[in-house]
UniProtKB/Swiss-Prot annotation:
In the N-terminal section; belongs to the malic enzymes family. NAD(+) binds at residues 175, 300. This is NAD-dependent malic enzyme. InterPro entries: Aminoacid_DH-like_N_sf, Malate_Decarboxylase, Malic_enzyme_CS, Malic_N_dom, Malic_N_dom_sf, Malic_NAD-bd, Malic_NAD-bd_bact_type, ME_PTA. Coiled coil: none annotated. GO terms for molecular function: acyltransferase activity; malate dehydrogenase (decarboxylating) (NAD+) activity; metal ion binding; NAD binding. The gene is dme. A divalent metal cation binds at residues 149-150.
Amino acid sequence: MNTGDKAKSQAVPASGDIDQQALFFHRYPRPGKLEIQPTKPLGNQRDLALAYSPGVAAPCLAIKDNPETAADFTARANLVAVVSNGTAVLGLGNIGPLASKPVMEGKAVLFKKFAGIDVFDIEIDAPTVDRMVDVISALEPTFGGINLEDIKAPECFEVERRLREKMEIPVFHDDQHGTAIIVAAAVLNGLELAGKDIAEAKIVASGAGAAALACLNLLVTLGARRENIWVHDIEGLVYKGREALMDEWKAVYAQESDNRVLADSIGGADVFLGLSAAGVLKPELLARMAEKPLIMALANPTPEIMPEVARAARPDAMICTGRSDFPNQVNNVLCFPHIFRGALDCGARTINEEMKMAAVRAIAGLAREEPSDVAARAYSGETPVFGPDYLIPSPFDQRLILRIAPAVAKAAAESGVATRPIQDFDAYLDKLNRFVFRSGFIMKPVFAAAKNAAKNRVIFAEGEDERVLRAAQVLLEEGTAKPILIGRPQIIETRLRRYGLRIRPDVDFEVVNPEGDPRYRDYVDDYFALVGRLGVIPEAARTIVRTNTTVIGALAVKRGEADALICGVEGRYSRHLRDVSQIIGKRSGVLDFSALSLLISQRGATFFTDTYVSFSPSAEEIAQTTVMAANEIRRFGITPRAALVSHSNFGSRDSESAFKMRTALQLVRELAPDLEVDGEMHGDSAISEVLRQRVMPDSTLNGEANLLVFPNLDAANITLGVVKTMTDSLHVGPILLGSALPAHILSPSVTSRGVVNMAALAVVESSHPV
């Protein structure tokens, strides 16, 4: 790396055209988009001896004796090769293997981002079919699967066919089959909305390259009839007897007809499949198509007809493009990472038609479900509902892997190509959930306990918020809690319809209407009794109880009409804490509230306290917070190991802060003699046992601390934010400690999954108070 590059910022400059921004993005802070990271420690001589000579001989011999154990001892079962010769790079054509490398690196990071699959991009100087087959097939010992990319037709057909015959691992040409799978899912859903049978549907295609023919082949597998398919390319209709630009794959769709141009064939068509060139489908041609036509205009960057032009010509049309700025984007990332995930996990020898069909039906089915909040954000906050503008899911819908990978793995087993069939699909789905929702594994004990107390009522102060509405549906579906939502009924009902959610107010969950609840006067009286001597006059109390939903929720918990409160999705933390403090109050003996935050990173779970409440807690407050935090951590099925962190390392400094932490340690040991705790210590000593042993060999803390206790709010909150951002960690919390009754104040950045997590924790707290 050039030394000058080190100083370059990661941020892409906002000014300049897209090309300049892309060049900057690819060059800084280090060239390219990939790196290799070790998955085993290499910190000492012993590690080196195990990773390499002499220890590495043991797995080598095990694999020699039983080749299937390569999946146990190497990364092969999670490693895919993205292979290209650069002869048909999207939008660029035949630019050669070296120039195609940025595209292949991009494909690699998509595999990793969306499915956790490791990839080597391999660009080969192999212009002929024979050369490609020889080179790629020789890679079989290294990889668990091969993704062919950007190889021109018709060579790509022959390369894939021969490799599939020769290799015992999946070989998948994504340009063909990825596009075909998504197109097939869109066609299934589009025809269903139009009330049409695929066996009777007339399909007109513009384009006869690899992707177009793969789409048509898969539609035939779904039930379309070849006699109803009319294929056009640059030479016009593919008809029987035509000689120009014909090949064996195209010939199967040759029609016995005098039609020659698109205008001859388009009349009465139910589906237009475009994988050709911009502007091919004219408005006057679209006007001649059947009722409720499905338009797949997939030419990039400009489709065969622009959606707004198509809508003007045919308001009843359903339109898919390859562009992200229009609904129904046909983007291969919808499927290829998840198909490979399922294929790799069951040790599939190939990706067959049954597996592709399973993926089609999984994608089509997901579009009929309620979209996730992540998918909604991908649509600029407008939540799509299954219909003409939402035939296929967003590529960012996190549930894709949860639907596609198990379906593919199951189809592989049923069709006899899985070498390691998945025996327990519930456990497999749980594993995938942990990849999608990194909180899944850590939260599992909490959810298990919550389901045993699912009758418990959780009241949500911001009941009109989309994230809360989505969380309420998840809680009801999973049997975790009985939600009570504070909000205006008409707003809640409108938003439930907008977001496509099935839950029904006053049937599935209770609604507390702040504008007209019959308990209003009782709530006002109770509130005034609590705060009347805190400067709140009766008139103000009436206004607050009508307008402050956190106050309403806290009163409901105080009165026993709810078991736990969730608030803070909107507004400042301090305001919500004031209301909770005034109404619910602190648990007996608790000196002050405090907040516990959980970060889940690649290295595991780490808890931080106090991250939100006390600016400069006393030694007594720190000690009490440590014990409360340790008790809370045990709810996760985790044994707490606490480190009281400081700028001082086991007495190295005599500052007021260091003395406070030393005093807190003695108090913690008196309050909780069984708790594994030590301090005061540096942050790196808390994490690294090696460093800690150097300065304090007889430390009472073993291994890596999972609870970091800070001397003040600045240190805790700043560390939390820095670590969260630098490690791309998932934040669970903040968890409010010390309240008399279960109540948690979230942050405005929380996701619906975060709301679900905290609601489940609140249910457990209400059933098993400390």
